[in-house]
Amino acid sequence: MAKLACLFPGQGSQSVGMGLDLQQNYSEAAETFAAIDKAAGRSLSSLCFEGPEAELKRTINTQPTILAASLAAYAAYQKAGGPRPDYVAGHSLGEITALTVASVLTIDDAVKLVEKRAALMESCPKGAMTAVLGMAPEVLEELCAQVSADDEKKCVVVANFNTRDQLVVSGDVDAVAKAGALVKEKGGKAIPLPVGGAFHSPLMSSAAAEFAQTLAGCPFQDAQFPVVQNVDALPSQAAEELKSKLSKQMESPVRWTAIVEYLAAQGVDTVVEIGPGKVLTGLVKKIDRNIKFFNVFDSESLKATLAALNAVTV
């Protein structure tokens, strides 16, 4: 039987104006933005709607605003009659959005966790990240291991397995630069990313430990539907298992390819990306062309998605 998954974006999907159309056209979206502003003690909605872009790009602002825009979009999707997902998943930050829509976290707790996560990631030790195209994951992993072995004080790892040939490495500035040079020597493309931290790498270990302490005091509930998590690309519904895996996420790779492959293996043939941008549906298309994909980021895309989903289920 065909199944549906809802996917939630992470950092990099933000844009000035995100969520504004839904806020203006769906009272549930407006109420969600208001609740998030109250929980944050600041106007995240104004940052979403008006920017400025330079402020929106700061990790401390990017992460909570993407959470806000995504949760508001899901509220509108629910109100408009969007079908209940069989699975949910989120890319990095998006996993916290997924946990919230699955009723694992309250909006208040989700906002507090994301604000803490963003602050820790923005203040983490200086590092670098580089996108790598045209190289098999196992080849890149071996290359990173070789670079790291050359200097025990430097490390570089594969941080994002976005598709089979779209990867991201993360680590010490020098080690990432060396890995990028070797990628080019071997015929691949290496594109430095405009970030100042080594996200999803061992350099995040101290931040991850502090985040785990915050998580320990945060109440989790069992999920209403399975959440396929980043660290192992497997589903969880038990509260403590969800919390344990989330605590490891900040210093572990995002296994997005494996998540999509798992969903397909479980019979998921349709995904809806809910929140700003179309990054995740673009990745899904490259991983499995048999999966139908839709987006919800404004009222027009919501109506088009629901019309298409209703046509599929009739």
Q: Predicted segments — roles?
A:
Residues 147, 305-312:
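Short amphipathic alpha-helix with an adjacent loop that forms part of the alpha/beta core around
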Residues 2-145, 270-304:
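FabD-like malonyl-/acyl-CoA
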Residues 11-13, 40, 102-251:
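Alpha/beta catalytic cores of group-transfer enzymes, especially the acyltransferase/condensing modules
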Residues 257:
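Polyanion-binding loop/helix "lid" in catalytic or ligand-binding cores
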Residues 70, 212-218, 237-254, 271, ...:
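Non-catalytic peripheral regions of patatin-like phospholipases
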Residues 263:
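Small/polar (Gly/Ser/Thr/Ala-rich) solvent-exposed segments
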Residues 92, 219, 267:
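Conserved functional loop/turn residues at catalytic and ligand-binding sites
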Residues 1-3, 152-153:
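Extreme N-terminus of proteins, especially the signal/transit-peptide cleavage junction
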